Amino acid sequence: VAILNIQLWYSAKAEYLAGARYAANNINHILEEASQATQTAVNIAGKECDLEEQYQLGTEAALKPHLRTIIILKQGIVWCTSLPGNRVLLSRIPVFPDSNLLLAPAIDTVNRLPILLYQNQFADTRILVTISDQHIRGALNVPLKGVRYVLRVADDIIGPTGDVMTLNGHYPYTEKVHSTKYHFTIIFNPPPLFSFYRLIDKGFGILIFILLIACAAAFLLDRYFNKSATPEEILRRAINNGEIVPFYQPVVNGREG
């Protein structure tokens, strides 16, 4: 059972790691859409922001399935967006760290929902692409039991539920997978070393098989040892085990009756 448990633990670790890579690949695809959208915004930034340019930005955001809005800022001021009237869904323009990614908490948005921001900056122009929390949570939703995947950007994290949180000190999710394309990490909890549920769920069939093999081996060994024993040994063993109670016939002298 101990050996089977260790094997199932290694198997669970491999599954959790594969799930984290799958989630990271999902986030990479979303950010690839954001990167492509910024190229359209770069071309528009060199023109005027009129209805045609806004229509192009809106079309670009609509055709990318995971994007919400595209915002062009010049000298820190909103210059053009993909929404009518140059509206934005941000209550304030956040300050980005050195990375081009930022997790914005619900307090920074108009609809009070957290978002992921992708930034592209050149000269005095900044292009922001917003990605909704639903798409991020959908990318983190890997159908594996017992594991929870969380997106980490710098010191901020967002999971399948809840708002953006800042890491302070120790966090129980010690396993991680880094993206090779963008500055984010998928962190997740390791599988427990021993899990009775995992042993039953994944190893029940193996346990039954081991039990059947053990019973068959015991039966064959018993048949082998009993077959090689002499009749006298079999009789003596049966008497010692109480399986046979000997009956002693008294000896009678024929002449004396």
Located regions from the model:
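Juxtamembrane extracytoplasmic/periplasmic/luminal helical "stalk" adjacent to the first N-terminal
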Residues: 1-49
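Extracytoplasmic/periplasmic sensory segments of membrane signal-transduction proteins
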Residues: 33-87
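Short N-terminal helix-loop-first-beta-strand/juxtamembrane motif that initiates sensory/input modules
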Residues: 61-75, 141-157
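Conserved beta-strands of PAS-like sensory domains
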Residues: 111-145, 150-154, 189
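Short, hydrophobic beta-strand elements of compact beta-sandwich sensory domains
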Residues: 124-134, 175-202
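Cytoplasm-proximal transmembrane signaling helix
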Residues: 197-233
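Active-site core of bacterial EAL-family cyclic-dinucleotide phosphodiesterase domains
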Residues: 230-257
